[in-house]
Amino acid sequence: MLGAVLIGVSGCGSPTADGTQGRPRSSPPSFFSGAPSGSASASGRQSAPDHADAQALPSTVWPAHGQAAFIESGQSQIQVGPNQRAAPIASVTKVMTAYLVLRDHPLQAGQDGPTLTLSASDVADTAHRRALGQSIVSIAAGEQLTERQALQALLLPSANNIAAVLAKWDAGSTDQFVSQMNAAAQSLGMNDTRYTDPSGFEQSTVSTAADQVRVVQQAMTLPVFASIVSMPSTTLPVAGTVANTDTLLGHDGFVGVKTGSDNAAGGCFAFRAVRTIGGKQTTITGVVLGQPGADQVAAGLMGAKAMVDRIAGQ
C-alpha cells in the first residue's frame, strides 16, 4: 500500500487562463453556479519518529496520479504522498516570486508600495509572450502599477509578463532574481527544487509537492500575500478587470493560493482550505502537482478539492 512520508518543517486581462505556458489547454473552469525520512511501518507507510503529531494516512487520501503533500494546523510535519520527484510546477512558481518581492519590499495593510513604470521593452516582451500563448495581462508603455497591483496581476490572472517585470525590479535582472529564488529555496529546506525562471514557463523549473508546501506556508504568513490570493478579481489600469484563476476560492473552505498548468506540469494547485475535522476548525495547506485532464486548470483544482474532502473525512 502506498502511504505517507512525514517531513518536519520549521516554522480577465489575460488572453489565456493561468499557466498555459505556451501550450494548449482550456480556460479556467467555473465549478459553481453561485458567485483548497523515517522508518517504515508494517503497513509500508513511512513515519518520522521524532514527531508524533502527524497521523499516518491511508493511500486512498492521495490523488491517483501525480504527487501531493499537505500540512494541517497544529502539526509540525508535512504529510507527503507517494511519487515525490522533482517535476515541472508551471505557475505555482509564482508563489516564490511573490514571496521574494514581499520579503524584499514589505507592504503593510493599506499600503500600495512603490510605483513601477512599464517600458516599451516590457510591452515588446509582452507581445512576444502573447505570441507564444503565455498567460499575460495587457500593458502599455508608461503605465504605472503599484507594487500591490503588480502582485495582483502576478497572482490572480497569473501574468508571466508581470513576473518578468517584478523580477527585474526586485533584483536588477531576471538571472539575479532566479539566483535569489534558489537561495531562498535552500534556506527553506526545499532540497528538490530548482528555479530557472520567475513565472514557471520553463520546464526546467522543477520542484516537489512537499517542497512547495514549505514556500506556501511562508508566503501565507505575509498578510498582503494572503489578502491578494483571497481576491476573486482585481482591476488594473490597462488590462481592466482580471479574474482569479482559482475558481474554488470561497467554496468548500478554500481561501487561495495559486493555480498552475501546462502540458509538462499537468494540473497543479497550491492551496489553503479551512475545514472542520473532528469538531475542530482545521487549516489545511497543501499542493497537488501533475493532475491529468483535458482541462488542466480544472484537474489541479479538483484534485486538491477531492484530497481535502478525503482528509476531512478521516
Where in the sequence are the language-model features?
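Conserved catalytic neighborhood of penicillin-recognizing serine enzymes
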Residues: 124-164, 241-257, 261, 276
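Active-site SXXK
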Residues: 89-116, 212
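Penicillin-recognizing serine hydrolase domain
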Residues: 17-78, 173-314
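Short, glycine/proline-biased beta-turn/loop segments that scaffold the active-site neighborhood
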Residues: 107-137, 230-239
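Second-shell loop/turn segments in exported
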Residues: 80-88, 134-141, 149-153, 164-172, ...
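Short glycine/serine- and small hydrophobic-enriched flexible loop segments
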Residues: 99-107, 168-171, 217-218, 309
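Export/targeting segments at the very N-terminus of extracytoplasmic proteins
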Residues: 69-87, 99-107
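Secretory targeting and sorting signals
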Residues: 1-15
